[in-house]
Amino acid sequence: MKFVLLFGVLLVTLFSYSSAEMLDDFDQADEDELLSLIEKEEARKDCIPKHHECTSNKHGCCKGHLFKYKCQCTTVVTQSGEETERCFCGTPPHCKAAELVVGFGKKIFG
């Protein structure tokens, strides 16, 4: 009887220790996931919206509906006659075509 009681106490102790370790692992995973979501949200806040200037940060455009916007540059002649490069975030033509096809597909197939 003493052996069974001792074995039961040992079993309960091991079970509680292992469940505490599992809970710690789950808590750590939740914290890591939360930190990665916060980092993504911060990066999303710092991005440049569509049709805004991206001359100084050509890789900082935001994500559109399906694709990330690309920094598109053109050469502009100023009133003084100087040529300068101006860039804006926009959707490339091949991405526009893909979004159009997806839009038609959603309308047809619901």
Swiss-Prot record:
Expressed by the venom gland. The keyword Secreted applies. It holds the Pfam family Toxin_35. GO terms for molecular function: toxin activity. Residues 1-20 form the signal peptide. GO terms for cellular component: extracellular region. The keyword Secreted applies. Disulfide bonds join 47-62, 54-71, 61-89, 73-87. Residues 21-44 form a propeptide. This is U1-lycotoxin-Ls1bb.
